[in-house]
Amino acid sequence: MSSQSPIYPYSYSQAAQLDPRITLARPPIDAALAPIVDAMPLPEELDIAFMRAFDLGVTIDTILEANPHITHAEHLVPKSSSDSVNLSIFSPTVSSGPLPVLFFIHGGGMISGDRLSAIPSLVDLVQEIKCVIASIEYRLSPETPAPGGAEDCYDGIVWLSTHAVSLGIDPAQIIICGSSGGAPLAAAACLMARDRQLPAVPIKAQMLLSPMLDDRCDSISDHQFEFGVPWNGLTNRTAWNHALAGQRGTENVSSYQVPARATDLSDLPQAYIDAAECEVFRDPAVVYAMNMWRCGSSCELHVWPGGVHLFDAVDNPDIPVVGAAIAAKRAWLRRMMKS
């Protein structure tokens, strides 16, 4: 679709009442969150040109200037099938021993974004929880169709495990975290690590935040939020079409490309999965958690009432649902990194 997709003409919080295309009942957006969501109108369909033009202006310099308590090191993760990919590692300036690491995989529908864009919202964890943050510059679709990005993340985990001691990282405390379009890459990397018997130490835990897990886009939440939310069904299908090179919804798709296609979720790292009540990813996230439980894997699941996709990125803990979501994530990370 052209980058000239029109701005959505209705307020998101009133879309169910105003948009005649919305015929299914659906939960309302949280009243305290609604003014913030409504103040950010977006094109009805977020195409690849629009998403790639969206630049938050985050650089290594801006991160370090705002956070003098951390240091940064850039590494190249070698790949057998392509050029190396960059891995940024943020560590405390002072540490007393090997630290846990959060291996972060950025969002952007697998078609946009970069390894630095979300770091400002994460970097205080370095000091608060005493950990290292690693963020990988995986290859994007459609230039590199799935599972290329997931393979990059898997290679990054293998490299990190192998070099953990020299990096000041505890190899038994590697937690992988994917947000939105980064979540299927995190989930796929866990499947790869299980199937390939990752060298050194397995991934300890996985964190899948507002996860983009299912290319079939046919759940109740997919239909409820086809229109009238920032990341809607139109945009979701567009991103999957790019990621899967035209194979979306077919049988020619593996679980490394689309984790929801996996039939065996046994022997996986314990998981934290969360989703917003008012987003297309809600029901696929719940089903993935249920399938983990069915297969004997452990998962903590949260569905946040009244939230939209990545609602807690507003980083306003005074909004009760935002504060609760942020607190739950951090409490889980503390438990994982201390257990």
Regions found by a protein language model. Name each.
Residues 98-107:
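Short beta-strand element of the alpha/beta-hydrolase
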Residues 109, 138-145, 213, 308:
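Alpha/beta-hydrolase active-site loop signature
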